[in-house]
Every structure is written in structure tokens, then in C-alpha cells.
């Protein structure tokens, strides 16, 4: 991986879950795990973010919210689905209002399975997302060759 030209910013959104993965995402920001050592910064504004980290599954109420946030993030952007609920719907999959994983409504680049996903796995997924982000940035600088982007990498 080449050196980053600027620090990537992540935006975390909890769709609908037990909040176990949210606690683990927040643990990544503490001094014990210190995700900022990779140059990653947390933001609350989608217009400033590069990496969209989603925990929890999609339900009828948050479907449009997730799409709206995704559309506000400038290109190139990377989506990381954290936890089994975000990847497939998890234990709530059979509930009447759960549609499934995040990939039902927006494209996902990195999947971090687990219930709850461990901070080490989340950091590994975000570091993989950094590589994908740099690839997407490089492709945006080059003329279109007609090749499709590969995604859906599992950590």
C-alpha cells in the first residue's frame, strides 16, 4: 500500500442491532486499540467521510436513512459491514421488520463477521477498506478501462 495523501475519515451508523458491535467499534477508538494510529479519524458528517462503517441489519424504518447517508458520502467511498447482523441480518433475520444485511440496499466492500465482532477484526476490516479506498482513488485518476470493481471481501 502506498502512503495515504490524507487521513481517511470513517462514519459509523448503527442500523438495528443489540449494540454489541457498536461497543466494539467504540473500543477501536480507545487508547487500547487506537485505530487513529493508522491515520483514521471518526466523523459525524457523511460529506466528510470516506469509509461508511455500518453495524446492525436493515429494517423498514432505516432503509431510506442508510441510502441517504450512502448517497451523501463523496466518491470514492468504501462500505464496511461490521457484525453478523450487518452482513446477513444475524439473529434478528427472521423478525418481521428486518430485511437482512446491509448489502440488500447498498454495495458492501468489506464484511467483518462476528457477534459481536472483535475490535481486532474491525480494525483489520478498516485497514482492508483503506486499501480498497486507495484502489478506488487510483481508478478515479485513470481513464475508464471497462473493468468492473471487485468487492465483497471478507475479513
Protein language model regions, located:
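Iron-sulfur-associated redox domains of electron-transfer enzymes in respiratory
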Residues: 1-155
Amino acid at each position: 500500500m502506498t502512503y495515504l495523501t490524507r487521513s481517511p475519515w470513517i462514519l459509523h451508523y448503527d442500523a438495528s442491532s443489540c449494540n454489541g458491535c457498536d461497543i466494539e467499534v467504540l473500543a477501536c477508538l480507545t487508547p487500547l486499540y487506537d485505530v487513529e494510529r493508522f491515520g483514521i479519524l471518526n466523523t459525524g458528517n457523511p460529506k466528510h467521510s470516506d469509509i461508511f462503517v455500518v453495524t446492525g441489519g436493515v429494517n423498514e424504518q432505516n432503509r431510506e436513512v442508510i441510502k441517504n447517508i450512502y448517497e451523501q458520502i463523496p466518491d470514492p467511498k468504501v462500505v464496511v459491514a461490521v457484525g453478523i447482523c450487518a452482513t446477513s441480518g444475524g439473529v434478528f433475520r427472521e423478525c418481521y421488520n428486518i430485511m437482512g444485511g446491509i448489502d440488500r440496499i447498498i454495495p458492501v466492500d468489506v464484511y467483518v463477521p462476528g457477534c459481536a465482532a472483535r475490535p481486532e477484526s474491525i480494525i483489520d476490516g478498516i485497514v482492508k477498506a483503506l486499501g480498497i479506498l486507495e484502489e478506488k482513488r487510483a481508478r478515479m485518476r485513470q481513464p475508464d478501462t471497462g473493468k468492473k470493481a471487485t468487492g465483497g471481501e471478507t475479513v
